[in-house]
Design a protein with these regions (language model features):
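Acidic/histidine-rich catalytic neighborhood of metal-dependent amide-processing enzymes
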Residues: 91-155
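Short beta-strand/turn micro-motifs at beta-sheet edges
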Residues: 68-69, 144-148, 210-215
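Metal-dependent amide/peptide-bond hydrolase catalytic core
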Residues: 10, 14-20, 36-38, 154-246
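Short coil/turn motifs at secondary-structure junctions
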Residues: 63-65, 115-117, 163, 230-232
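Fold-independent oxyanion-binding glycine-rich loops
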Residues: 41-42, 60-62, 114, 138-141, ...
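N-terminal helical capping/dimerization or prosegment-like subdomains
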Residues: 1-57, 65, 220-227, 237-241
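Active-site metal-coordination/substrate-binding segment of hydrolases
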Residues: 53-112, 130
Length: 246
């Protein structure tokens, strides 16, 4: 199994705490013969091979979700945070470019981007800085196929507030109203997906959390709503629909 993969997965790097992993990867690329390896202004790890006029960007992300997992190999399977999402693809990029080496007319740029699991700050910086001829994004969609696109992710907080009422009152609580709103959102999404056979074309909805409380004067309830958007639904369209439902 690749030393790059094992070494990279061994560097615990949840979003916002990637620096140690970034420094490790920069040194790893240097040792593999990259012409340049450095940390860019956004904190991304960058390795450059070749100086040709045609540029290929191989972009992965070096951060992970939180929750450290002991790194171990069992029966040819590597366990550890980020082994799949997405240090596996990133390590493949690093080793593949090192194996290919310098090619006449080409420049390969491998980037381990930061903050992907948050606001994609690393990738946003890359999008502004580079204008490559080709870009390949490393994500866990199996080794034997190529994904042509990914859904966008849209998050929203739906907040319900109302005056405090006596607990024996028939008035609905803020929490009850929030539940009604959630059921209406689900009903809309179910109707939208009814004739969509491909998952890629569907709206994928999740209730990421719900909080409620009161201060003696006012009740409040918050729905934390997540959605994976198909191509035909822009973030603006989705947020407008949510506001309409509310």
């Amino acid at each position: 199994m690749s030393d790059t993969l094992i070494g990279l997965v061994s560097q615990y790097s949840p979003s916002g705490e990637e620096r140690r992993a970034v420094e490790w990867l920069v040194e790893r690329m240097k040792s593999l013969g990259y012409g340049e390896s450095f940390i860019d202004e956004a904190g991304n790890a960058v390795g450059v091979m070749g100086k040709g006029s045609k540029q290929v960007i191989l972009l992965g992300h070096i951060d992970t979700v939180s929750g450290e997992i002991s790194v171990r190999e069992e029966n040819g399977i590597l366990y550890g945070r980020g082994a799949v999402d997405a240090k596996g693809p990133l390590a493949c990029f690093v080793d593949a470019v090192a194996s290919v080496g310098v090619q006449d007319g080409w420049q390969f740029v491998v980037i381990g981007a930061v903050e992907e699991e948050r606001n994609s700050e690393g990738a946003r910086f890359v999008a502004q800085k580079y204008k490559p001829d080709f870009a390949i994004i490393g994500e866990p969609n199996r080794w034997d196929r190529i994904a042509l696109g990914y859904k966008g992710s849209a998050w929203a907080n739906v907040i319900v507030k109302r005056e405090q009422a006596h607990t024996a009152s028939r008035e609905e609580t803020a929490a009850e109203i929030a539940v009604d709103v959630w059921l209406k959102i689900k009903a809309y999404v179910s109707e939208f997906n009814e004739d969509k056979k491909r998952v890629f074309d569907q709206l994928l909805l999740t209730l990421r959390g719900m909080d409620s409380g009161q201060d003696g004067f006012e009740q409040s309830a918050t729905l934390k709503v997540g959605a994976r958007l198909p191509v035909e639904v822009s973030p603006e369209d989705w947020y407008q629909k949510l506001e309409g439902i509310v």
